[in-house]
């Protein structure tokens, strides 16, 4: 839904009949704490154009099913709920139970920063920063542009590295 997400109406993708297109997962990236290996998956151009995220949902489901704790920034409100929506829409059972640590919640609860966005926190703590993106990246990925899908995968890998560093900085306050 669009409730409280403040998405400009110009950013809603519509089909040729003017109807809002259903959303799907383009990609994911994750890592185990202190492990240098970044795990990720992304739709192929054909999967993207068909809006078919089934294959990558299976791969992230498998990872979540192995996890005891999942760390995310706004993960409780966004990532986990979005994944659960895609799992149920694809008739997948939920992964095994896991706990979450939401660094956005920790930052809001423990500190009075001027912003709580992950990008702000990485800059504030002088940590590796997120790659810059624009809405057009998502549009191009949904159109199956392989170069842009590669950019999305790189964006996600950087995001995960930054998240780990933010988590480690905030962890003493958890």
Give the ranges of each region predicted by the language model:
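Conserved RNase H-like, two-metal-ion catalytic cores of nucleic-acid enzymes
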Residues: 1-65
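Metal-dependent phosphoesterase core characteristic of DEDDh/y 3'-5' exonuclease domains
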Residues: 23-42, 66-174
């Amino acid at each position: 839904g669009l409730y409280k997400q403040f998405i400009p109406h110009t950013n809603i993708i519509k089909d040729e009949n003017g109807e809002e297109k259903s959303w799907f997962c383009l990609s994911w990236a994750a890592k185990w704490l202190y492990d240098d290996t970044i795990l990720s998956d992304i739709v192929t151009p054909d999967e993207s154009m068909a809006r078919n995220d089934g294959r990558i949902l299976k791969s992230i489901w498998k990872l979540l099913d192995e996890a005891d704790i999942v760390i995310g920034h706004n993960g409780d409100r966004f990532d986990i709920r979005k994944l659960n929506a895609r799992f149920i829409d694809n008739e997948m059972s939920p992964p095994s139970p896991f706990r979450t640590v939401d660094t956005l919640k920790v930052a809001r609860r423990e500190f009075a920063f001027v912003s709580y966005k992950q990008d702000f926190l990485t800059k504030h703590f002088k940590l590796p920063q997120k790659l810059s993106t624009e809405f057009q990246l998502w549009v191009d990925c949904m159109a199956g542009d392989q170069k842009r899908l590669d950019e999305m995968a790189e964006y996600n890998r950087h995001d995960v590295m930054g998240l780990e560093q933010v988590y480690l900085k905030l962890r003493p306050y958890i």
